[in-house]
């Protein structure tokens, strides 16, 4: 297992990434603030989801990827040749996907799955407590406490997405990545998940990709505007969305392109 990286900042330095020889990300430099919601916005195809997947090395699953630069957690470069513990990395940097992806097992086992992989809370009583704690944290406990052994596939899509978030939380991450995590949900479920993120930032640093500017305006503390694989503007969300400095940002917010 890699050295302890807990409570250390996540920083991107001079990151360049190409797929099949085509540049996707160009000289990205970012520091993600602790215990804040960072929203990454920009037009379709600008590299938002690619950047998110690079942060926990899920981009490794894409063929013909070339990447250079640094993604630092504290003093450790997670894309360096010496970094190999991807299981531990993905525990610390969890991902909530665009579409809910519950595992084909019970609700209880979905929450417990990561703990078992990482050898956490090995006593049955401890695991029971963890499942209840994190189901409560995402507002699911009262809804499912009497059917924990039922298939997670029977949950509504909104419940499934909260369960996926719960699965990430149960292994005690430092960062939560969310890739369009509400785009497949109805408005009520979307609001529930948004409210959860706002509550969870007390204990986690949350990095979200969203195509919905309204969502970013509602919940972002910090904003990153990407365009054609480049960071155009970053800063406090109120400043970026209310008084942008860059002309491209102003045009994007005005709907000139999307």
What are these regions (language model features)?
Residues 176-179:
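Catalytic Walker B motif of ABC-type/P-loop ATPase nucleotide-binding domains
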Residues 70-77, 124-146:
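Conserved ABC ATPase "signature" region
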Residues 172:
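Conserved catalytic motifs of ABC-family nucleotide-binding domains
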Residues 66, 77-94, 117, 240-244:
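ABC ATPase NBD coupling module
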Residues 149-155, 159:
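Conserved ABC ATPase signature
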């Amino acid at each position: 297992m890699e050295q302890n990286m807990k409570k250390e900042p996540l920083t991107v330095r001079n990151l360049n990434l190409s797929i099949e020889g085509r540049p996707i990300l160009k000289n990205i430099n970012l520091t993600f603030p602790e215990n804040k919601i960072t929203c990454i916005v920009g037009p379709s195809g600008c590299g938002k989801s690619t950047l998110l997947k690079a942060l926990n090395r899920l981009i490794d699953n894409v063929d013909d990827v070339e990447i250079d630069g640094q993604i630092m957690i504290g003093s450790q470069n997670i894309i360096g040749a010496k970094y190999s513990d991807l299981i531990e990395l993905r525990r610390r940097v969890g991902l909530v996907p665009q579409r809910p992806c519950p595992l084909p097992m019970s609700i209880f086992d979905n929450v417990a799955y990561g703990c078992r992989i990482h050898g956490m809370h090995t006593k049955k009583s401890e695991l029971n407590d963890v499942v209840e704690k994190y189901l409560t944290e995402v507002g699911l406990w009262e809804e499912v406490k009497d059917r924990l052994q039922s298939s997670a596939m029977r949950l509504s899509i909104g419940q499934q997405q909260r369960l996926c978030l719960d699965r990430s939380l149960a292994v005690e991450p430092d960062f939560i990545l969310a890739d369009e995590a509400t785009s497949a949900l109805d408005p009520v479920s979307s609001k529930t998940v948004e409210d959860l993120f706002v509550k969870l930032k007390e204990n986690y640093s949350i990095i979200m990709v969203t195509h919905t500017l309204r969502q970013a305006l509602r919940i972002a503390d910090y904003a990153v505007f990407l365009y054609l694989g480049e960071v155009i503007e970053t800063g406090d969300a109120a400043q970026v969305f209310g008084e942008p400095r860059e002309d491209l940002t102003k045009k994007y917010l005005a709907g000139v392109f999307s």
